[in-house]
Amino acid sequence: MSSTVSRRRFLGTTAAVSLAASTGQAAAPSDKIVIGVMGLSRGRSLADSFAKKPNVEIKYVCDVDSQRAASCADLVMGAVGKAPQAIGDFRRILDDPDVDALVCAAPNHWHAPATILACQAGKHVYVEKPCSHNPQEGEWMVKAARTHNRAVQMGSQRRSGETLQKAIRMLHEGVIGRVYSSRAHYYSLRGSIGTGAPAMVPEHLDYELWQGPAPRTPYMDNRVHYNWHWFWHWGNGELG
């Protein structure tokens, strides 16, 4: 992806493209849902969980860090006796007509681009929270899902939990009367990530693809993997 393409320009273009919507996909020969998992920090756990479902086949595990991709492939192999393909570019998943859905657990700045491209490729999507890096991207994702008739689900586990659904339903039913205001607080005890220092990009990391549509910045030793959360180019802090 060209370093001269801004994330707004990239997403605006992909959201506006009108491709012929696929109204259905042929079932896989095994009658299983064939998926590819992108982003293998949180995605490693998701791949393990999905692989153990009797009606799911993990065909690809994808990460720009080749070591993580290989490790996750070994994990799935150990769980079900069949290794998925370990790849570095998620677009290979989208190009495969046998794949039904993309599971996107990549950093936040990739959620919208990957989801939109997957919808355009005729894939359904499960995307980790937050669904997008900013509200505008969320609108583009909704448009892509509707245009291409794809199912897109955001994995907000607490929102989908039975207990919280019951609580919200009771609020809507007026159990405590009209709600005028609410307050929420979130505290997490975290150590400092330091200021970081310029470093050579590890051979096993495709840092160019990791940055994707985000502004280009030099590689630092305190960002990849998890600490990208604390930089606005890629994350949303404690909010996301």
Question: Where do the PLM segments sit?
Answer:
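A contiguous active-site-proximal alpha/beta segment in oxidoreductase catalytic domains
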Residues: 124-126, 131-209
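Glycine- and other small-residue-rich loops at beta-strand/loop junctions that grip anionic moieties
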Residues: 39, 104, 130, 156, ...
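Rossmann-like dinucleotide-binding domain that binds NAD(P)(H)
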Residues: 208-212, 216-240
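Active-site/binding-pocket entry motifs
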Residues: 67, 188, 216-217
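Active-site-proximal cap/loop segments of hydrolase catalytic domains
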Residues: 61, 76, 138, 164, ...
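N-terminal glycine-/serine-/threonine-rich beta1-alpha1-beta2 phosphate-ribose binding loop
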Residues: 2-127, 136-151
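Hydrophobic alpha-helical scaffolding
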Residues: 62, 157, 200, 236-240
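Residues embedded in well-ordered beta-strands within globular domains across many folds
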Residues: 60-62, 103, 180-183, 211
